[in-house]
Amino acid sequence: MSAEKISISLPKELYRELEDFITRKGIPDRSKIFQIALRNYLDENREGTEIIYGIINLVYDHEEASEALTEIQHEYKDNIISTLHLHVNERLCIEAIAVKGEKSKLVELNNRLGQIRGILKARLLISFPYEKT
C-alpha cells in the first residue's frame, strides 16, 4: 500500500485520551485509527449520486410507532435491503434497517423515520464502497 506521511496537532487532553484508548485496547497501529476515523468523517460529509450502503438504527416505542414505521418502510422498499428487529422490553424495540441507494435518498428516509411519533432514536450510518488500498 502506498501511503503519505502527515503530521497533525492535537490538544493535549485529546492526545491523552487517544493514548489511553490505544493502551487499553492494545492497538498496535495508531495510523489505522486515523484512517478509519477519516473515512467515516469523509463518508458522512461526501456528496454525490453514487450508490451507497448503510444501516439505519432505530430505537422506538412500538405501540406508538409501528404503523407509521411500516408505512414508510413500504414507501422506500427499493432502498431497504433487510431489517433486524429486537425486543428490548414490552414497549421498546430496536430495529436495524440495511439500506442501499443515493445518499440523499437514504438521508431523506432516515429523516422521515426520525419524525415518527414514538421514535426515540434514528441514526444513519453510511458506507461508500472502497477499493482495498
From Swiss-Prot:
Gene3D superfamilies: ACT-like. Chain A, domain 2, Met repressor-like. Ni(2+) binds at residues 74, 85, 87, 93. One of its GO terms (molecular function) is DNA binding. It comes from the Archaea. The keyword Hydrolase does not apply. Binds 1 nickel ion per subunit. Its cofactor is Ni(2+). Belongs to the transcriptional regulatory CopG/NikR family. PANTHER family: NICKEL-RESPONSIVE REGULATOR (PTHR34719:SF2). This is Putative nickel-responsive regulator. The lineage of its organism: Archaea, Thermoproteota, Thermoprotei, Sulfolobales, Sulfolobaceae.
